[in-house]
Amino acid sequence: ECRYFWGECNDEMVCCEHLVCKEKWPITYKICVWDRTF
């Protein structure tokens, strides 16, 4: 199971296709954001 857009992610919870796990200020944990691919 993968994490969708804006979902919390880490080493165990990976993002779905075309998403990348990043820290987005001001959020302190990492979330899945678009990696600009299609």
From Swiss-Prot:
Entry superkingdom: Eukaryota
Any one GO MF annotation of this record: potassium channel regulator activity
Record's keyword annotation contains Secreted: yes
InterPro entries per the UniProt record, alphabetical: Huwentoxin-1
Keywords, sorted A to Z: Amidation, Disulfide bond, Ion channel impairing toxin, Knottin, Neurotoxin, Potassium channel impairing toxin, Secreted, Toxin, Voltage-gated potassium channel impairing toxin
Disulfide bonds: C2-C16, C9-C21, C15-C32
Phenylalanine amide carried by residues: F38
Localization terms from the record: Secreted
The UniProt record lists the keyword Disulfide bond: yes
Signal sequence region: none
Function (record text): Inhibitor of voltage-gated potassium channels. It specifically inhibits Kv2.1/KCNB1 channels.
Miscellaneous comment: Negative results: only weakly inhibits Kv2.1/KCNB1 (18% current inhibition at 300 nM). Has no activity on Kv2.2/KCNB2, Kv4.1/KCND1, Kv4.2/KCND2 and Kv4.3/KCND3. In addition, intracerebroventricular injection into mice does not induce observable neurotoxicity symptoms.
Domain observations: The presence of a 'disulfide through disulfide knot' structurally defines this protein as a knottin.
Family of the protein in this entry: Belongs to the neurotoxin 10 (Hwtx-1) family. 13 (Hntx-13) subfamily.
Protein name: Kappa-theraphotoxin-Hm2a
